[in-house]
């Protein structure tokens, strides 16, 4: 299973990751998947000057739903961005659907705006 996740990841040109923010972290299943695709010799390599990502030519879109408003400064979204940068991905985008718990009366509006942003991103993704 470990190698099948890695191989599946390597075969894709575009990756979309969608997750909730849980206690300032990502869900455990997403963490497990990231651990499976972070493989020395497959997605990064060791060099004399340190680790180097070898994943090239992929587009990654990370969509995260947050009850509060963090503007991309939460540890979970930073972790996801850091991992894919580490792997060598340079075409990385994030979309945040946030504030639904903070402003429940605006939840429909928040989701509508996020869908509009996603539609705009889809044009170039």
Listing of model-derived features with the role each one plays in the protein:
Residues 2-78:
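Helix-loop-strand module that forms the ligand-binding subsite of alpha/beta enzymes
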Residues 1-13, 65-66, 89-101, 105-106:
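Short secondary-structure transition/capping segments
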Residues 74-125:
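Glycine-rich phosphate/pyrophosphate-binding loop and the adjoining helix
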């Amino acid at each position: 299973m470990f190698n099948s996740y890695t191989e599946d990841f390597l075969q894709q040109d575009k990756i979309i990751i969608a997750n909730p923010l849980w206690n300032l972290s990502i869900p455990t299943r997403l963490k497990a998947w990231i651990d499976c695709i972070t493989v020395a010799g497959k997605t990064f390599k060791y060099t004399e000057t340190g680790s180097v990502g070898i994943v090239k030519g992929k587009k990654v879109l990370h969509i995260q739903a947050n009850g509060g408003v963090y503007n991309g400064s939460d540890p979970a979204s930073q972790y996801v961005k850091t991992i894919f940068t580490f792997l060598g991905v340079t075409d990385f985008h994030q979309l945040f659907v946030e504030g639904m718990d903070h402003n429940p009366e605006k939840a429909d509006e928040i989701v509508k705006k996020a869908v509009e942003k996603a539609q705009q991103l889809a044009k170039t993704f």
